[in-house]
Amino acid sequence: MNIFALFEARVRDAVEALTRAGHLPEGLDLGRVVVEPPRDASHGDLATNAALVLAKEARANPKALGESLAAELRADPRIVEASVAGPGFINLRLDPAIFHAVVRDALEAPEAFGRARLPGGPINVEYVSANPTGPMHVGHGRGAVFGDALCNLLVAAGRQVTREYYINDAGVQVDVLARSAFQRYREALGEPFAIAEGLYPGDYLKPVGARLAETHGRALLDKPEAEWLPTVRETALGMMMDMIRADLAAIGIRHDVFFSERTLQESGAVKALLAELRAKGLVYEGRLPPPKGQLPEDWEDREQTLFRTKEFGDDSDRPLLKSDGSYTYFASDIAYHRAKYLAGATELIDVLGADHGGYVKRMQAAVKAVSDGKATLDVKLCQLVRLLRAGEPVKMSKRAGEFVTLRDVIDEVGRDAIRFMMLYRKNDATLDFDLAKVVEQSKDNPVFYVQYAHARVRSVQRQAREAFPDADLSVAALAREADLAVLSDPGEIEMMRLIAQYPRVLESAALAHEPHRIAFHLYELASALHSFWNKGKDLPQLRFVNATDRKSTWARLALVEALRSTLAAGLAILGVTAPDEMR
């Protein structure tokens, strides 16, 4: 049950009633009308901006319109009080039975509770797409966790999602990888080797060299580069992708599709794209003005094959061919996004590092062009991650050619800490990740605080079974028998309110593509539970389990089970475990 959607519909009914009565003009735009929690919980359970956003179009005084709407809403028996505050906000206080119904809904259908059915076609989410030239670093991990949680969130909101990884295996960097691996092959055979400037120096390529030596012996040594390069490249790429897949699996990241850039080019998709754009009149031969500021060393004033991206909102037109006649990265990227659209996706989401900020407008313009406006692209940029230890910066490089990898961090703090903390800040804000703080058992460590709330409910349930060994304490029995009307303490009411807010949080997070909203709400739920627990330490009558008060115990067991299942559902979206015990 989503009470916000329920009462938003009720507010719309009130507007329609005033329209039928001739007090409001017909055809008002209700698109900006929302029902949300009030800023101050003492003002009520819900608030709506209906009078404020409709007043101008209706040529009415916002406060007077608010009073008229409030009068209509008071006729609903589920609304105990409707009052106008400030310039025209309407605050609603609900019959407690509404919140009792939410708790029972969470108990009776925990798998469905909070889930939405948002409209829309298939979505393609591309995330990680790290170059297959070495181990993943912590920045890759942030994009990976964000993308995976976003997919989980969209699925929970009823959307059809394809999870995709784009393997950049066609650029210059993979030839550099092969040449670097060849030197490790020479090393494995005891031959002189040199990691020249421009090659990848890391020890992570030593196993590649050993594999090549084991497979080919000395057969590659005397061959010219043109002959050994494809063989070495395939082995190195395969082993790098195996390493990346293993790191992703270690933090629970999964993909449905691994799409190869090389297969895109070999299939003729880029050539077909250019032909299509030419047929649409979107490609021309021309010159670009010099870029502002200091000119790059490789800039040339020459005639180029240009894509008319300015017509679709970009800052300038973009080249599709390099001076040597090969395709630009942009041309390949357009062909790749065209392939996603042709595969059926009408909404595309790219999760990229913050250094791709200049890429957004041109790619959105390209998607609009190749889909004739039928597909959209949302680019989510993930800012940098700063590694700290007890507040002090961690040196990111360990030795020449080596750096702190995602696997290093996984091994030190574990999957749950990484996933929760990567999502406990908005993706476009820099994240300080403190290796010491994320394993603390304190309120200041959000992942511990939320997981401990889940474990604490399980502890309460074990206590209840000890106190009432012969009672049926199953979830079904609690949903059927608990008298939730006895829940009147402000702490109990706050827990019910937060449970009721979860469906709205999930839906709004999915619409905004912002999984951090789930993490924030879980912390609020955990905080409400822990606060009430602490009250019970001083006031025995407020303890969750009271052997002499079966009625209150049953009601509180029902309440905390609803809260626990909500925590578990939210943690599942984040990809974090919901432990029954904390050790």
UniProtKB/Swiss-Prot annotation:
It is found in: Cytoplasm. Keywords: Aminoacyl-tRNA synthetase, ATP-binding, Cytoplasm, Ligase, Nucleotide-binding, Protein biosynthesis. A motif ('HIGH' region) lies at residues 130-140. Its EC number is 6.1.1.19. GO terms for cellular component: cytoplasm. It comes from the Bacteria. Its main location: cytoplasm. One of its GO terms (biological process) is arginyl-tRNA aminoacylation. Pfam families: Arg_tRNA_synt_N (PF03485), DALR_1 (PF05746), tRNA-synt_1d (PF00750). Belongs to the class-I aminoacyl-tRNA synthetase family. This is Arginine--tRNA ligase. It comes from Methylobacterium radiotolerans (strain ATCC 27329 / DSM 1819 / JCM 2831 / NBRC 15690 / NCIMB 10815 / 0-1). The gene is argS.
